């Protein structure tokens, strides 16, 4: 389904994977169930948020003809035949730039196992979305630590990584990520629309769109994360970084070809609602009046 000019595909952030998912089989089966359910509902992009204290998984030693390998093969075939896009989103408690060694090691372990799983289901490209996390009052130093830890991962894992912007001005804008991460280790930027309204890094929304897209490899459709504010003023300026339950406007693209993940509390219901109603929604007016 083509959702208007240059917006090809849409998905939503799924937060229903439990931190107590027991072992590789149940995790793989939950992924298969989710992508199959999304596909049936006309949603060709699946994004799964990895919860805090996620059960350690081990995909490095899956035996042939085991129930795990059968599910993994089913996911591989499904993704290949349907060209379904699969992403994992790691919130900021997975923190490669942390000053606490155990946090860094736990984060690297989760990233490595997800990368192995993605390799097994045939996903070799950008598919793991990271936030940098706390800046400790020193954004540059934190980004340098983050980049060092990225480069300590295996090449296959690094090729799947991307990084996204934050809403707090003390954290990481698209401007920060461009100079501090993309130019250093080449991770593409996943642009988050609502956080940019509160932490623009001196860029207009249009400028941030174009800069984020420019970080993606040629031939790959960038993935962005979109939500609208739960509170706006009379000029349409966002007053709260908390996302609204549904979208009231069409997702802007500025003529750029992108796929979009909706980050909204209503999840699947909100995504289906957008698919059903986007033609009747108003175009979004990007107001020049906004927050720094």
Kindly give the residue locations of the regions a language model identified.
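Active-site beta-loop-alpha junctions enriched in small/polar residues
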Residues: 6-10, 51-53, 91-95, 131-135, ...
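A short acidic (Asp/Glu
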Residues: 57-59, 97-99, 141, 173-175, ...
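Active-site glycine- and acidic-residue-rich loops that bind
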Residues: 25, 164-175, 197-207, 269
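Charged helix-capping and loop-helix junction motifs
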Residues: 65-70, 143-147, 175-176, 203-210, ...
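N-terminal pre-domain/capping segments
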Residues: 1-86
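Active-site acidic/histidine proton-transfer and metal-coordination neighborhood
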Residues: 68-188
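Hydrophobic faces of well-ordered beta-strands that scaffold small-molecule active sites
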Residues: 1-12, 44-48, 86-90, 126-130, ...
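Histidine-acidic metal/acid-base catalytic patches
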Residues: 187, 198-292
């Amino acid at each position: 389904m083509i959702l208007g000019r240059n917006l090809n595909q849409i998905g939503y952030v799924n937060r229903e994977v439990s931190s107590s998912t027991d072992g590789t089989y149940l995790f793989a089966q939950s992924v298969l169930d989710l992508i199959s359910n999304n596909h049936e509902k006309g949603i060709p992009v699946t994004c799964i948020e990895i919860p805090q204290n996620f059960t350690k998984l081990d995909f490095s030693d899956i035996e042939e003809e085991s129930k795990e390998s059968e599910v993994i093969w089913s996911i591989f075939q499904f993704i290949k035949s349907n060209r379904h896009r699969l992403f994992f989103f790691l919130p900021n408690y997975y923190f490669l730039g942390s000053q606490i060694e155990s946090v860094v090691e736990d984060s690297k372990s989760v990233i490595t196992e997800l990368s192995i799983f993605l390799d097994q289901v045939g996903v070799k490209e950008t598919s793991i979305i990271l936030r940098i996390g706390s800046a400790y009052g020193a954004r540059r130093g934190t980004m340098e630590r983050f980049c060092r830890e990225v480069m300590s991962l295996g090449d296959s894992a690094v090729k799947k990584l991307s990084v996204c912007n934050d809403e707090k001005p003390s954290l990481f804008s698209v401007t920060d990520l461009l100079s501090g991460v993309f130019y250093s280790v080449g991770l593409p930027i996943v642009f988050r629309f609502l956080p940019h309204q509160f932490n623009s890094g001196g860029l207009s929304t249009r400028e941030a769109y174009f800069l984020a897209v420019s970080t993606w490899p040629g031939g790959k459709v960038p993935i962005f994360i979109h939500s609208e504010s739960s509170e706006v003023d009379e000029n349409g300026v966002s007053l709260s970084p908390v996302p609204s339950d549904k979208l009231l406007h069409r997702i802007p693209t500025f003529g750029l070809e992108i796929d979009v993940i909706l980050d909204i509390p209503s999840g699947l219901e909100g995504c289906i609602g957008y698919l059903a109603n986007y033609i009747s929604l108003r175009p979004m007016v990007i107001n020049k009046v906004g927050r720094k």
